[in-house]
Every structure is written in structure tokens, then in C-alpha cells.
């Protein structure tokens, strides 16, 4: 029974390699209205929803991002491809960072690269970052599988299978959580220095 569970868990971790994300060449190269942006994001990121009714992006969110200076104002109610890139970064960051931290991270990037004429703009920044993260996904999956196997060795002295599995699952969750906590702490420390750029 536990072998099947372990195989299922490894399959789940490997499925992360197939999660929906928006590739740079999928970002429309035209300005879009807010409804078009929310539809686009919903269509392309639906597999990352935890529950079917979850919203990836709403009009209210976009308006709040603009009010909080995370997103430059639209131009005649239309949003450029670079607005879309910022919305993607916000979408990914908001899962683990505060709005203030996101603002600190994006402000210098937006200031320097939003509608930049010097050859590098937010689209080229996204392309570079996307490529690097895409290449790292296999490493991340292998690391999680290693942590799963290591967690399965925890509590080996417990004879009750159900109790041991419960505790080894908890150990796996704690291992992943610790990894997230450490990385989040590093990001927050870097964010402090961002205010000086």
C-alpha cells in the first residue's frame, strides 16, 4: 500500500514539470482590454488553480495593483504586453510575498525597463528569466523527490504503518516548508537592498 502511495506521490511531483505557465511567445503582442487580460490569464494558468472557482486574476486585483503602484496605469483602458509581464510576476510573487515586498522588487525593474527604448524591456527580461527557470524545473522536481524519500526514512522506529506514514508525510511537508521559508527569508533580505537601487 505504501509503495503505491509513494509512486503516486512521485508521479504528482513529476507532474509539476507539466504545470501551465505562460511562455514568452504566448504573450499577445498587442494591447488588451482588462477583460481580455483576465480571460487570457485564466485560460493559460487554469491548471495552477487549487479549486475550480479560484480566480487567477480579476478586474479588482488589476485596479488594486495600479492603486498600489505595482502596475503602471493603462493607456486608454488598454494594457500593453509589458503590463502583462508585470501581472505575471505579481501573480507568481503574491503566493509568498507581501504586496509591499512585491512593490519593492518590481519598482526599480518597472522604472528601468517598462517601455524602455534601450533594447532591453520587460518582455526581454521575462524571456531571460523564463528560460532560466524552465531549465531548473527538473532540478526542483528531483530535489523534492529526494526530500520525499528522505522523509520516508523518518520515524522508521514506529511500528504502526498508519502513524509512521502520517509522520513521514508531516516530515515531508516540513522539509518543503523549511525550504520555502529559507528562500523567502533570502528574498525579503534582498528586497531591503532593492530600496537603494
Give each language-model segment a name.
Residues 86-95, 169-190:
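Short, hydrophobic/amphipathic alpha-helical patches that form generic packing surfaces
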Residues 2-111:
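Basic helix-turn-helix/winged-helix DNA-binding cores
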Residues 195-196:
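Conserved small/polar residues in nucleotide/adenosyl-binding loops
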Residues 104-105, 109-181:
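Exposed, interaction-prone assembly regions rather than primary DNA-binding/catalytic cores
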Amino acid at each position: 500500500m505504501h509503495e503505491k502511495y509513494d509512486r503516486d506521490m512521485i508521479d504528482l511531483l513529476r507532474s509539476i514539470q507539466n504545470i501551465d505557465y505562460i511562455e514568452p511567445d504566448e504573450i499577445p503582442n498587442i494591447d488588451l482590454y482588462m477583460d481580455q487580460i483576465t480571460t487570457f490569464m485564466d485560460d493559460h494558468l487554469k491548471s495552477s488553480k487549487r479549486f475550480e472557482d479560484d480566480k487567477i486574476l480579476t478586474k479588482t486585483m488589476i485596479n488594486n495593483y495600479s492603486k498600489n503602484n505595482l502596475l503602471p496605469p493603462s493607456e486608454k483602458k488598454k494594457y500593453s504586453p509589458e503590463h502583462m509581464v508585470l501581472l505575471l510576476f505579481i501573480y507568481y510573487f503574491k503566493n509568498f510575498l507581501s504586496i509591499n515586498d512585491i512593490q519593492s522588487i518590481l519598482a526599480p525593474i518597472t522604472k528601468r525597463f517598462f517601455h524602455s527604448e534601450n533594447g532591453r524591456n520587460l518582455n526581454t527580461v521575462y524571456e531571460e528569466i523564463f528560460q532560466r527557470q524552465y531549465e531548473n524545473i527538473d532540478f526542483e522536481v528531483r530535489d523534492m523527490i529526494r526530500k520525499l524519500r528522505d522523509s520516508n526514512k523518518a520515524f522508521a522506529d514506529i511500528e504502526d504503518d498508519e502513524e509512521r506514514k502520517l509522520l513521514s508525510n508531516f516530515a515531508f511537508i516540513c522539509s518543503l516548508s523549511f525550504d520555502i521559508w529559507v528562500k523567502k527569508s533570502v528574498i525579503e533580505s534582498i528586497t531591503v537592498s532593492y530600496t537603494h537601487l
